[in-house]
């Protein structure tokens, strides 16, 4: 059984609000860079880029980071298999930039920690801010988002399923019971 948390219109409103908050907090966006965490974070970053361009008339660079190599909670089945860093693409030097790291759902904080490691390997940003569509709680690390589309308290027996039209053909966020 699933329960709808955000529909297409609510996701659009949340990303528009986050875009305004990014502009306000940074007093403009001249030194900002948007970086999406693969996979859905990239599409959210592109949507934020469009919203910010509509509001400010500035097209921010958008990068992507694939944190596969950095995950500390991956289970590797064979000792010969190692996670591979793939597809990380940040079009400008992060040094001195205000980097807005973007993901769909914030849960334990491990994915964000891994993304921070990947970003720091690319240079020394002036500041890193975190934007998420959904914050579901249950943090295992001291990570807190700067921008949140919606806080959705959950139990550990529930999961948040974020779907974006670019990947899934529909924009919606649902909460579901985990299946064992």
UniProtKB/Swiss-Prot annotation:
Please indicate the residue ranges that the annotation assigns to the motif PRPP-binding.
Answer: 99-111
**Group of enzyme by EC:** transferase
The UniProt entry, under InterPro entries, shows: PRibTrfase_dom, PRTase-like, PyrR, PyrR_bifunctional
SUPFAM superfamilies from the UniProt entry: PRTase-like
Q: Name one GO molecular function term.
A: RNA binding
| Protein EC | 2.4.2.9
Q: What catalytic reaction does the record list?
A: UMP + diphosphate = 5-phospho-alpha-D-ribose 1-diphosphate + uracil
- Going by the entry's taxonomy, the superkingdom of the source organism is recorded as Bacteria
Protein family per UniProt: Belongs to the purine/pyrimidine phosphoribosyltransferase family. PyrR subfamily.
Name of the protein in its database record = Bifunctional protein PyrR
Q: Which organism is it from?
A: Halalkalibacterium halodurans (strain ATCC BAA-125 / DSM 18197 / FERM 7344 / JCM 9153 / C-125) (Bacillus halodurans)
